């Protein structure tokens, strides 16, 4: 009923604007002035064959050269598809930042499993460069890590290449972290005040609080506990913090690692918004802000082949790292402003993890799409596989030119397992609020079991039967090709 009334109010507001042309013209002028005033800049590949210091044995593609030119102008999200050459792009960009003195010590953050390959490619492209690549075994243990960090801090490196695991263990100065958390506490208290909550300084939930205020107070309590734990932590003598390393440019590969942004929202009833705090994302944001303070908002670069995997919140999170000033210009520096400008919630009936159905509300409709794309492309350099000349010749074609869908019947055994999962979910639903909080992991566990059961019942329990109808067996049948027998 409430959602229907909300829709009626929105429709009445739109009708009022349409019936009063002078108001419509005034609002259109405000919107175009504040939100629709960007033209996507075109970047040209420089007319050089090789960058200064780079080997002549490697030729960069035009989109890589354009990416370097763009990165030298502003912080950028490189949404480049897998295999399009982000390694050479990041290496060249880091070396050019160093050459033109836009950065003194650029750092590239890569996956630990690929750091040796990345470092080898970087040294191949720039044979005479002073490149420090810290593999995982060089930073295992506190003493090894301290030695490695001292090497970064004391060396005059052209490039520093770090694995994600090591980078995540480098702490910021506790004084900076405390100040950063305090800023977040102030924002949350202001949000409680704007929602009409009494005693915004307190994290204690009042019976008169609205659902939104209750959720904000829970976030406030968590942040206060984090700040207190930081203050109670004993001082580490001789500790080397991120601020001591001299790094003044960050180039983060596989940026989806940091997409679980640590942000708060008043849209607590919207499904699909991952509002849970990620220590990695919180830590990354602190380091990003430190570098932006040193460089006037520059020198932050992210690369990922999957910038959006779940929700539009990921677009906002990536832009919050790289282009916070652009979000401010659009008036969407807070997530709720972004969501209200570019999305619309939709209430639908959806299956639960047990196969039953419930009504949920999600951000599924987009609005002001042209302006949103303009904002995104102002911050992001997007390259698809088909944008790379000759890519189609390197990739095998699909059979019949499209994916093949294989539909399987549910086995009787799978039906029994799913019914058992449903029963356990119904039992959890009947628990009291306190019991649910103590067993909050149950829905996620059941969801995982249901996903595994759909693939093969033995993934739920090894003693379950090997059913011919399972997806794993169907995959084997579809892919297995018997080796030709010699006569």
Model-derived features: where do they sit?
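Conserved pre-motif I regulatory segment
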Residues: 41-79
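Residues at the beta-strand->loop junction immediately N-terminal to the Walker
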Residues: 79-80, 304
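Conserved SF1/SF2 helicase motif Ia
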Residues: 82, 89-120, 128-129, 294-298
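Inter-lobe coupling linker of SF2 helicases/translocases
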Residues: 145-192, 204, 211, 218-249, ...
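Walker B catalytic acidic pair
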Residues: 253-254
């Amino acid at each position: 009923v409430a959602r229907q009334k909300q829709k009626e109010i929105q429709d009445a507001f739109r009708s009022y604007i349409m019936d009063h042309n002078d108001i419509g013209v005034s609002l259109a002028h405000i919107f175009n002035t504040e939100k629709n005033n960007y033209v996507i800049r075109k970047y040209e590949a420089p007319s050089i064959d090789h960058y200064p210091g780079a080997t002549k044995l490697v030729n960069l593609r035009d989109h890589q050269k354009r990416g370097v030119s763009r990165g030298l102008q502003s912080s950028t999200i490189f949404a480049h598809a897998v295999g399009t050459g982000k390694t050479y792009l990041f290496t060249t960009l880091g070396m050019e930042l160093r050459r033109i003195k836009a950065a003194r010590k650029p750092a590239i953050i890569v996956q630990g499993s690929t750091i040796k390959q990345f470092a080898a490619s970087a040294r191949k492209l720039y044979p005479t460069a002073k490149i420090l690549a810290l593999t995982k075994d060089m930073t295992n243990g506190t003493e090894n890590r301290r030695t490695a960090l001292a090497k970064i801090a004391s060396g005059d490196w052209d490039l520093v290449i770090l694995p994600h695991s090591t980078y995540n263990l480098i702490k910021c100065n506790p004084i900076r972290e405390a100040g950063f958390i305090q800023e977040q506490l102030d924002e949350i208290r202001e949000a409680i005040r704007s929602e009409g909550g009494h005693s915004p300084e307190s994290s204690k939930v009042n019976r008169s609080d609205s659902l939104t205020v209750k959720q904000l107070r829970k976030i406030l309590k968590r942040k206060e506990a984090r700040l207190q734990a930081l203050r109670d932590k004993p001082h580490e003598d001789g500790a080397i913090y991120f601020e001591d390393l001299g790094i003044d440019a960050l180039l983060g590969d596989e940026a989806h690692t940091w997409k679980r942004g640590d942000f708060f929202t008043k849209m607590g009833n919207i499904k699909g918004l991952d509002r849970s705090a990620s220590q990695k994302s919180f830590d990354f944001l602190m380091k990003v802000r430190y570098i932006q303070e040193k460089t006037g908002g520059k020198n932050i670069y992210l690369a990922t082949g999957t910038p959006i995997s779940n929700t539009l919140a990921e677009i906002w999170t990536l832009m919050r790292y790289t282009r916070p000033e652009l979000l401010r210009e659009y008036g969407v520096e807070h997530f709720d402003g972004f969501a209200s400008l570019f999305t619309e919630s939709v209430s639908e009936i959806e299956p639960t993890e047990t196969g039953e159905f419930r009504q949920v509300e999600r951000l599924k409709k987009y609005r002001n799409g042209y302006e949103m794309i303009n904002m995104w492309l102002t911050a992001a350099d997007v390259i698809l596989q088909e944008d790379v000349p000759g890519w189609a010749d390197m990739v095998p074609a699909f059979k019949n030119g499209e994916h093949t869908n294989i539909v399987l019947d549910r086995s009787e055994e799978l039906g029994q397992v799913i019914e058992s999962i449903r029963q356990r979910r119904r039992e959890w639903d009947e628990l009291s609020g306190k019991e649910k909080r103590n067993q909050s992991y149950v829905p996620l566990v059941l969801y995982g079991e249901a996903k595994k059961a759909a693939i093969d019942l033995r993934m739920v329990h090894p003693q379950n039967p090997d059913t011919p109808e399972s997806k794993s067996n169907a995959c084997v049948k579809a892919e297995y090709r018997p080796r030709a027998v010699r006569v």
